[in-house]
From Swiss-Prot:
Subcellular location: Cytoplasm
Residue ranges of coiled coil: none
Source organism of the structure: Polynucleobacter necessarius subsp. necessarius (strain STIR1)
Assembly description: Forms a cylinder of 14 subunits composed of two heptameric rings stacked back-to-back. Interacts with the co-chaperonin GroES.
The protein's name: Chaperonin GroEL
Keyword Cytoplasm tagged: yes
Length: 547
């Protein structure tokens, strides 16, 4: 086992805070409409140019072990916020840095770190409640476009494309992002369905960079029981292999010998296959299998209708133009089912929605309607170069996540103003002791920081603007893009409530952990000095007598 360096108290915390500052200072240059780009070197190919906070954070590894620990903890803030809300990574990083920086001043002055953390947690809980009060639903296409535009670094065209896509496939519909083949962004809507089941083995993956299995023009076998014996499958596999097309198997489960054989055939290239579990449970699973059958023009192989796997022919299988199978989701694009049959199925489910008594049943039935009727929207991102394409695609992904978050939990005024307004509701908050009060004041100071950073990146005086915004009310704030004060919601400067809440919660969580850390253990640097080698032989002077 390698030797370890153990560092205690302020010595450990100071180094870790240095790491926090290095990462946060790199990330926060990207915040706001006038934030700057960051250029990232790659070990191969050209550099990446990005204004996406989480992309910058992910690239940072520091040489000093303790500094790197601090940086990695804040990187976790950015990643977690991106996972939950899809955006707000830079805001989360800025908040975390501020809480750590202010908190360290109190810790060094002798305040109890655990009480500071309790005070921080109290303030954050109260701030989240205030944000929920400020929030309003995001319903119009215009608002969705505004959220998308801001998340895509004020790119109006991206926001507009996402709003159009949501309008066409519905808010529950599936939207995917692909590389375009022209300079312009394109939107295409194709009939399709997504369900929450992924591949049963990672060996089915044929696009490692995306971690998905993509099948072009596949057959779809639908079976309502488990498949364990490969002999049952052989007749249909032989027919599909002769056709030269791939096969997706959707069954209650595929296991043992059957799964192993499918994987081996897939790896050897004998027949391209993928297997997934059927979505849903019990009666709902049967209904969803039937939905997929109607969408793909196939039949669910079931004993009730006198069909077994051995008797299955190609006529019983569904077909689709394309299938994408990920770790947790499967998307069926352009199924070969009859349009009238799909329409009749949708009408049938809508009748069931009307008759359903429980909210849960209604919700699940509405999900099925959305899956059958909504389709899949594909946004093709256009750009002049590959570097620009990657950067733009990352922004479209961010914008897509942000708009979904906005539809889910509503919107609040952007530009850091919502946090300033939420401060008003927690100014009277008191802790159980003076140390907890200090924790509350740390959060109050941190909640100003996103606005300060946005203003600083725009080249203005942060102190003056913060005072002006605090003196105003409601949605009024500072628009860094225009340099003017006004109603930010009316001007389209809005943020998803979910994003700001996630940023604040994650920042406080990790910053609190860092403040309560009193010992850091890292691997000791290896001794690079030369090895023992042979002793000095004193030169060759004693060998003269051999001549």
């Amino acid at each position: 086992m390698a030797a370890k360096d153990v560092v205690f108290g302020d010595s450990a915390r100071t180094k870790m805070v240095e790491g926090v500052n290095i990462l946060a200072n790199a990330v926060k240059t990207t915040l706001g409409p006038k934030g700057r780009n960051v250029v990232i070197e790659r070990s191969f190919g050209g550099p990446i140019i990005t204004k996406d906070g989480v992309s910058v954070a992910k690239e940072i590894e520091l040489k000093d072990k303790l500094q790197n620990m601090g940086a990695q903890m804040v990187k976790e803030v950015a990643s977690k916020t991106a996972d939950i809300a899809g955006d707000g990574t830079t805001t989360a990083t800025v908040l975390a840095q501020s809480i750590v920086r202010e908190g360290m001043k109190y810790v060094v002055s002798g305040y109890n770190p655990l009480d500071l953390k309790r005070g921080i947690d109290k303030a954050v809980t109260a701030a989240i409640e205030e944000l929920a009060k400020i929030s309003k639903p995001c319903t119009t296409t215009k608002e969705i476009a505004q959220v998308g535009s801001i998340s895509a670094n004020s790119d109006q065209s991206i926001g507009q494309r996402i709003a159009e896509a949501m309008e066409k496939v519905g808010k529950e519909g599936v939207i995917t992002v692909e590389d375009g083949k022209s300079l312009e962004d394109e939107l295409e809507v194709v009939e399709g369905m997504q369900f929450d089941r992924g591949y049963l083995s990672p060996y089915f993956i044929n696009q490692p960079e995306k971690q998905v299995a993509v099948l072009e023009s596949p057959y779809v076998l639908l079976f309502d029981k488990k498949i364990a014996n490969i002999r049952d499958l052989l007749p249909v596999l032989e027919q599909v292999a002769k056709s030269g097309r791939p096969l997706l198997i959707i069954a209650e489960d595929v296991e043992g010998e059957a799964l192993a054989t499918l994987v081996v055939n897939n790896i050897r290239g004998i027949i391209k296959t993928c297997a997934v579990k059927a979505p849903g449970f019990g009666d709902r699973r049967k209904a969803m299998l039937e939905d997929i059958a109607i969408l793909t023009g196939g039949i669910v192989i079931a004993e009730e209708i006198g069909l077994t796997l051995e008797k299955t022919t190609l006529e019983h299988l569904g077909q689709a133009k394309r299938l994408e199978v990920g770790k947790e989701n499967t998307i069926i694009i352009d199924g070969a089912g009859d349009a009238k049959a799909i329409e009749a199925r949708v009408k049938n489910i809508r009748v069931q929605v009307e008759e359903a008594t429980s909210d849960y049943d209604k919700e699940k039935l509405q999900e099925r309607v959305a899956k059958l009727a909504g389709g899949v929207a594909v946004i093709r991102v256009g750009a002049a170069t590959e570097v620009e394409m990657k950067e733009k695609k990352a922004r479209v992904d961010d914008a897509l996540h942000a708009t979904r978050a906005a539809v889910e939990e509503g919107i609040i005024p952007g530009g850091g103003v919502a946090l300033i307004r939420a401060m008003q509701g927690i100014k009277g908050l008191k802790g159980d002791n003076a140390d907890q009060d200090a924790g509350i004041s740390i959060v109050l100071r941190a909640m100003q920081e996103p606005l300060r950073t946005i203003v600083s990146n725009a080249g203005e005086d942060a102190g003056v603007v913060v005072n002006a915004v605090q003196a105003s009310k409601g949605n009024n704030g500072y628009n860094a893009a225009t340099g003017e004060y006004g109603d930010l919601v009316a001007q389209g400067v809005i943020d998803p409530t979910k994003v700001t809440k996630a940023a604040l919660v994650n920042a406080a969580s990790v910053a609190g952990l860092l403040l309560t850390t009193d010992c850091a253990i890292s691997e000791a640097p290896k001794d690079e000095s030369a090895g023992g080698g042979m002793p000095d032989m004193g030169g060759m002077g004693g060998m003269g007598g051999m001549m």
